[in-house]
Structures are given as structure tokens and as C-alpha cells.
Amino acid sequence: MAGVNEIRSKYLEFFRAQGHEVVASGPLVPNNDPTLLFTNAGMVPFKNVFTGQETRPYKRAASSQKCVRAGGKHNDLDNVGYTARHHTFFEMLGNFSFGDYYKAEAIEFAWDLITKELALPESRLMVTIYEDDDEAHGLWKKITGLSDDKIVRLGAKSNFWQMGDTGPCGPNSEIFYDHGDKIPGGPPGSPDEDGDRFIEIWNLVFMQYEQHEDGSRTRLPKPSIDTGMGLERIAAVLQGTHDNYSTDLMRSLIVASAEASKSDPDGPHAVSHRVIADHLRSSSFLLADGVMPSNEGRGYVLRRIMRRAMRHAQLVGVAEPLMWRLVPALVRQMGDAYPELRRAEALVTETLRLEETRFRETLTRGLKLLDEEIESLGGKGVLAGEVAFKLYDTYGFPLDLTQDALRSRGMSVDQTGFDEAMAKQRQDARAAWSGSGEKATEAVWFELRDKVGATEFLGYESEIAEGKVVALLVDGQPVDKVEAGTDAALITNQTPFYAESGGQVGDTGIVFSADGAEFPVIDTMKKLGALHVHIGKLARGTLKLGDIVEMKVDKSLRDATRANHSATHLLHEALRRVLGDHVTQKGSMVGPERLRFDFSHPKPMTPEEISEVETIVNRVIRQNAEVTTRLMTPEDAIAAGALALFGEKYGEEVRVLAMGLDDENPNGTYSVELCGGTHVRRVGDIAIFKIVSESAVASGIRRIEALTGEGARAYLVAQDRIAKEAASALRISTEDLPARVVSLMEERKRLERELAQAKKQLAMSGGGGSGGQESPVQEFGGVKLIARKLEGVNPKDLRGLIDESKKQLGSGVVVLVAISEDGKGAIAVGVTDDLTSRYNAVELVKAGAAAMGGKGGGGRPDMAQAGGPEAEKADAALDAVKAAVGELAGAA
């Protein structure tokens, strides 16, 4: 029986032998289509090739593409675990022709692979075609020998494929496998086609038309082929099961979940193990591709998936985080086919562990609220939308998690009510938003780009250049001229000013004309990826369209920014070497004063790791090697070892920066990255690198702030001065300073403990007041009572003092009011065990707390405590408890 990994390899090798380029899977976050949440089909990485916007050095390709469907139009999340074929993560096998072969070859390849390489019996196969595609009908009969009843004509809904409202489109053929009459269901096109007997295993799309805006279609000059075969589906067929979760790969993950939770994989929690197995795959691959859990966008979808799996882990009865313990099992199964998963194993493991640990407590509280609401409904009916929204807003419960919890009880959610609550929150948020301050609309920038074209950037070679004024804007609107004293935006045909992008701030400087106009530039922005927009206020003279101007970048600030930007490249590589290959850049800010670098890592760096990173970067800086730049295609650059930043969009040609020398690297270079920013000429120009902070930005994302050059030198001088001043004040050497600080901290803690103990002793001996009574012990109806007001005592010490007082009394009631040094009040009541049937400490403490402006109080019948914001009413609180005790004593 062929395993999933063997089937994947066999598919790719078959098409390699047919002259196809075997292309590695693209990332789950598509870098060529901002409209897609995740890559959800095998053709997504090739979309621009099909439309002609991109060319590749091959005309035939085959791939096994990672896909996720868990949000937006394609959302399988709710059904995962309950059905045989729904997944959030799946692999799509595909072969593609870009104007090379067409229908005949596509059908022949598919039939040969299925019937010869995979050895499926022809008697179990049937196909569908588009109802008007006589050509496909003839080819299927000729190539396969299928009878007419095995070639089913269907309408456009199922057998005509379109990329969108416009663009390439065409008929498609689907190949179905018949599981046999022991499984209910009918053939495609029949009334009961939704049964499980006939399963689609391969879809062949024949792209032969161009769809136009008016609805008309014209034939493409070079028709293409796009096919897709779900690996999980074909594996199920080849392994003799109609359930994808019974295949060897999925079964291994289900068994791993069951073993880790000490439960039966096929018992009452079978659905939960299926959910965990599926969601482990999607969560792990999304994390490996750079998506981190968050409260918006792709990160929120990831968090929904993770939390749904975590809720099912709780249903199984696992008390500790589970998913992170299953990552090694997943890597064993899929790490060879997808090396990025193996590289990111540490990041995936730690992120899952942290996310589940944080969610556990919230999950418990949220489920308690949900159980209470279900109980109030008698365990049936519809949960109110506002309750579902509260679970979402307060406890982080995605709606589908709540729906999933209700599903097993036969209940549902008021979706309309939930949507209304969500809409109200968004409306409130919009009302509170003051706006971005952006004056020029996007329409203006589009018009200008079409009119004047892209700005040519000359700043790599020089900080000074001549330009022609091609656009002026005041208050976001184009004008013909600008007078002195006016805030304006200036666009020239070419510029040495770097526009803010890639994390690097825009250049500043000055622009002036021959007739005396001076325009100080305070910022440079990039619009539509093409226009360099210089922002400032005209200091003198007049600027007009068509003027020739001299443009000078502030060289000192540019040089400082260069150093910081180059340092981020050295830092990135050092982090990967010290922490692991899972480190990827998640954001940066590079300015003249400092640099900020955000990166994926699941936990704080240790002081030793920070020191090692600094050492590596400064060692490379001291080499003073030349920084080299080459222009290449993105594909060639990455193939040559350049590091591309996740999520960054690259054009047809990119700058490849190589920095530093490294004997360990095959090409002898320390760092190679794609980057369009400005950089130093030699790494020695950075001078020195110093990390000043390392902190958390979000779950799984850390931030380093650092200084270079003069900024780093000034920082070190200041730190040295502070250390020397502190050492001088303590009359020790700077070398002894750390040990002395530790000693002083320990001494302070000891003195604080002694002071607290002395205060308690003083208070209990009567020095802290006793509520106006000379003797601390009073009697009410034969019941002894101690009532004290304790000044300067920490409320957290009340429990111990209550216990001591109860021992002193033997039998009775104790009430203590503590007033801490910050003026906050707290009251505690203790009742000895022999009296708890008559006096309840919780009820007594509520009476005292109310007198001090407090509400409630919690504890046990023998000990209870509450807060009291009005500490000045401490005596009244003591009197209130005395009165309550007196009443109960009298009643007895």
C-alpha cells in the first residue's frame, strides 16, 4: 500500500519524466495576489504566468502545493473533524502547461498516471465534461476507451472554470472514482450525487478563452492547462478507504494525539482527535510560513484554528497544553517534503505551547459562562447573539468555536444578533477614530502616476542631483505653483531622496531653484510604489511646474541611516545563527538615530544570546569588507542563496546586497539579502553595533532596538559615566558594582521583612490601635471578640494575623482592619471552628466592608476578607461587625 509521501513523490517524478519542471510549493501567504487570504489552490503561485504578467524559464510545471481553506469564501473550518474529506490544510498535486501542450496531452498524462503508475482499475473510473465540449468528449473516448455512459456532460456550474469576472477561463473535466455500491451515493449529475460513493479525484482545466468585461469570450492565442488533484483524496482511494482521516499520514497524527492524551483514537473523542490532527497541520505550516497568531487578518484566522484545536484537546480531558507535543510527529511525516517545516520546528513548538498556555485559563472561564447560558436555556434552542459576542469580545472565543461547542448539544447561535453586536462595535470604533491626516486621495496619486510616470531614484550613487518639477500639491490637490510659506508636496522626474519604504525612513534635505526658491524637505514618501513625494514648506521664492531644481540630501543623516540599515542585515543573520533558522524578519524601522528590528522567536533572548549576537555583528564590522550589489531576478537571487523577506513584493529585477566575509558560507559571504534601501559602502562604516533593548511585540514576535556609529559610542559613554558615578557613591570599583547591587537588594528585602514583622507585632500588642477599646478582648453574650485597627499593615498579612488571634482567643471572633501605607483599607474576620455554626465570617465581613464603602467579600465560614476603599471609616467597620456579633449573640 503506497503511503502519502510515496504518492506525492511518484506524482512529481512522473511529470518530471514528461518534461515538467518540478516547482517547490509556494508559501501559504500568496505574494502575487493581495485579494487572497491564503493560497487555496495549486495554480495560485502561477496565476501571473497564466495571465501573461510574469514569465518563467519553463513552459511545463508540476508541484505539490500547500493550501489552507479557513476563512473568506473558501472556509472549511466548521466541518473539519465531522466529515470524511473536509480539511483546513491540504496538499494539491498539479501539472501545468503555459501555452505548451493542451487537452490531448493533459488527458493522456492523467489517464496514464492513474491507470498505469497508480494502477487504479479503469472500471472504477468515470469523467465529467462541459456540456458543449465535444472536443473533450472525443479525446476521452479516443485515449481511454471509456463508453459514453462513463463520460457525463454537465453545465457551467460544475464544469466551466473562471479565474474571475475577467481573464482566462475554459471548460474542465473531472475524473471520479467509484468506491462501489457498498457506499451510498450516485454518479455525478444524478439526484444523489452528494453521496460518498463517487469521489472526484482530479480536475483538468482547459484554459482556452479570455473573458471580457462585457461578458464576451475570445480564444486565447496559446491555450493552457491547470490541473489539481487533492493528495489526501487520491491517497484515500489508493489505500482502500473513503475517509481521508484513515490514510497513513493523518492516522499517524490522530494516534499521536491519542497517545499524548492517553485516550482511544476511535473512542468517544474520535472527532476531537481528527480536529487536532488537521488543525496541527494548518497551524504548524502557517507558523512556518511566517503567520503569527493575532487579533486581525491572517493572524486571527490562525488563532481561530489553534483555539478550536485547543478546545477539543480540553474535551479529550488533557489538563496541560497538547498541540506543541505533537509537532515532532508532524515533522517526521512531512519535514522531508517541506524543509521549511523542519527549519521552523522550534518556533512552531514554542508558539503553540505559549498560545495554548495563555488560552487555557480564558477557555475555562468562557466555557463556564457558556455552560451557564446553556443551562438557562434548558439545554436546547438558540444562544443569544449578544452572549456569543461577549464570548468573542471578552474571552477570545471565535464564533465558530462557540458554534462547535453548541453543535454537540443540538443547539445553535443567533447569527443575526452576533452580527449586529459586531457591527455596533465597529461603528463605535469608527466614531472614535479621528482620521489618518492623509489629505491627498488615492485617486490623485493614480492620476499623477499616469500623467508624470514613475520617479527615477538616483540616490544609490549620489546625494545631489538635478530634477524637473513635474507635480506640486497643496492640501492634497495638484497646483501649478507654490508661494513662500506654503506647506506642499513636490514631485520631480528624478531624485536623490530615498522615499520611506522597506522600514527605512525617508530622506530629508533641501531643494532650491536658480531663481532663489528654497524648499526644505522634512520627509520623503513613496506613493503607489512609483512616486517619490517630497514633503515640506517653501521657505522663500516661488516653485512652478517645469522648474529645474537642485536637490541635496542631508548627508550626515543619510550616512547614519545607511549604517543602521546595513546593521539590520548583519543583525538578521546573527539572530538566525544564534537562535535558529526559524528567525525571520517581521518588521523594521531604520532611521538616523537608531534601528528597530522585529523578528519571529517564541521567547525572550537570554543575556548570553544577546551578547553573542552583538559579538558576531561587531566581528563582521571589523572586517571592513566591501558591500557588493548586484541586480538579478528574484528567482535567480533566491536560488543563489539570497534571503528574501517574507511577505515582501519584488519586481522583475531586485538589488542583492552581500555583506561581510564568512568561511562557513558556501559562497564565502556572511549576509546576502534582497533589499532596495541605501547602505554603507564598506561594513566598517557602521563602526560599532550595540543592542540597547530586547522585548516582546506580540505572541511569538520579539523586538531588538540597537544603535550604531556615533549613537552607539555616545550610549556607551553615558553608560560608563553612570556606572562610575554609582561606584563612586558606594566607594567601590566599577568591577564590584554588580555584586554590591545584589548585596544591597538582599539587605533591603531583609530589612523590609523585619519592618513588616515589627509592625505586625506592634499592632497586635496594642500599639496600632484597638478600635477605641483599651482591652483588645471583649465579650458579647458570652462570645469573646478581638477588634483591632492596624495602621501600616499590608492587607496580605491579615490572614496570618487572624490565625494568630484565633489561637490567642481559643474560642471567639476576630475582626481586623488593615490600613496600608498607601492608604488602602482591608477588613478580615475569623471565627473559631466551634462557633462557625452560629457566626459566618463571610456575612460578618460583608457588614464591615459596607461600612468602609466596599462591596461583597469572599472566603469561608471560618475566614473571610474584603476591601474597603474608605479607609478613614475603619472604626465604623469594626463597630458594624461588633453590632452584628452582638445581634447574633442576643438572638442565641
Swiss-Prot record:
Its EC number is 6.1.1.7. It holds the Pfam family DHHA1. The gene is alaS. This is Alanine--tRNA ligase. One of its GO terms (biological process) is negative regulation of DNA-templated transcription. Belongs to the class-II aminoacyl-tRNA synthetase family. Zn(2+) binds at H565, H569, C675, H679. Residues 852-871 are annotated as: Disordered. SMART domains: tRNA_SAD (SM00863). Its main location: cytoplasm.
